[in-house]
């Protein structure tokens, strides 16, 4: 790699660029930016991991650490809100009751009055974990905490493994909901209204978790990268509006994920001709 960069630099100094293809132009521009320290590409490298080795398994240590931190925040907030329950709520109890009411309305709107109660804890947990994870990446200075192997802490949802795990949990949830409600008759949905739709219905079972996971991962990663680039280039007040926009989009992503999870579960349990 060093030989390639040295060759590019010598080429820039002593030769013409006209004979190089467009791809070489791009590589030369990026190498020049890196040499001039205007844009430290290595600081934005994605994929440096702090591994925890358990037997033959390698786990992403920073993802587990930040996930446990988010879970701890949620547990502390729940305990603080329920420690001294008042008839007239105030403070954090008032906030948590508002959040509970919001989550209840979200689950009811997706699943209906009769079916939403058993699934409220699942949908609510999804929303709260994703919401707090996203906001932790936007508000907390994770990168100031030094960890081994040169890795950097980030929001749990900044790791594709986290978003895939959440999406697979959602898939298991709507399979379980359908089988619990309809038994083996659930699989009749794959050939309705006509059997020729069977391949498409099977394909949907793969595309649903893929779309859920990559949508969440892509939005959170892109937001953090854009803010990091702007902070490097214009480290004053310019990135602040974009950071505020990032907080808004992070909340929207949590809402979208929880809403789609509820919609998929409702699709699995609804009967033919049943109104939502």
Curated annotation (Swiss-Prot):
It is found in: Cellular thylakoid membrane. Keywords: ATP synthesis, CF(0), Hydrogen ion transport, Ion transport, Membrane, Thylakoid, Transmembrane, Transmembrane helix, Transport. GO terms for biological process: proton motive force-driven ATP synthesis. It is a multi-pass membrane protein. The keyword Transport applies. One of its GO terms (cellular component) is plasma membrane-derived thylakoid membrane. Its main location: membrane. It holds the Pfam family ATP-synt_A. Disulfide bonds: none annotated. The chain crosses the membrane at residues 27-47, 61-81, 120-140, 159-179, 225-245, 246-266. InterPro entries: ATP_syn_F0_a_bact/chloroplast, ATP_synth_F0_asu, ATP_synth_F0_asu_AS, F0_ATP_A_sf. The keyword Metal-binding does not apply. One of its GO terms (molecular function) is proton-transporting ATP synthase activity, rotational mechanism. F-type ATPases have 2 components, CF(1) - the catalytic core - and CF(0) - the membrane proton channel. CF(1) has five subunits: alpha(3), beta(3), gamma(1), delta(1), epsilon(1). CF(0) has four main subunits: a, b, b' and c. Belongs to the ATPase A chain family. NCBIfam families: ATP_synt_6_or_A. This is ATP synthase subunit a. It comes from Synechocystis sp. (strain ATCC 27184 / PCC 6803 / Kazusa). The lineage of its organism: Bacteria, Bacillati, Cyanobacteriota, Cyanophyceae, Synechococcales.
């Amino acid at each position: 790699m060093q030989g390639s960069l040295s060759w590019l630099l010598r080429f820039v100094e002593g030769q013409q660029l006209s004979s190089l293809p467009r791809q070489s132009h791009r590589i030369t521009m990026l190498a020049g930016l890196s040499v001039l320290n205007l844009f430290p590409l290595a600081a934005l490298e994605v994929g440096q991991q702090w591994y925890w080795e358990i037997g033959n398994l390698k786990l992403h240590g920073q993802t587990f650490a930040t996930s446990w931190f988010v879970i701890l925040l949620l547990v502390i907030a729940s305990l603080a809100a329920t420690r001294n329950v008042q008839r007239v709520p105030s403070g954090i109890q008032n906030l948590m009751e508002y959040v509970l009411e919001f989550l209840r309305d979200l689950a009811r709107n997706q699943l209906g009055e009769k079916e939403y109660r058993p699934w409220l804890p699942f949908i609510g947990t999804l929303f709260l974990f994703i919401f707090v994870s996203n906001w932790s990446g936007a508000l907390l200075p994770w990168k100031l905490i030094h960890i081994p192997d040169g890795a950097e802490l980030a929001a749990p949802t900044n790791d594709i493994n986290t978003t895939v795990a959440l999406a697979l949990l959602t898939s298991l949830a709507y399979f379980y909901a359908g089988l619990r409600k309809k038994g083996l008759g659930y699989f009749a949905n794959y050939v309705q209204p006509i059997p020729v739709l069977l391949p498409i219905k099977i394909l949907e079972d793969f595309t649903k978790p893929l779309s859920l996971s990559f949508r969440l991962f892509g939005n959170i990663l892109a937001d953090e990268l854009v803010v990091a680039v702007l902070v490097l280039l214009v480290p004053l007040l310019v990135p602040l509006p974009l950071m505020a926009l990032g907080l808004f989009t992070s909340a929207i992503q949590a809402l979208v994920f929880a809403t789609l999870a509820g919609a998929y579960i409702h699709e699995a349990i609804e009967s033919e001709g049943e109104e939502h």
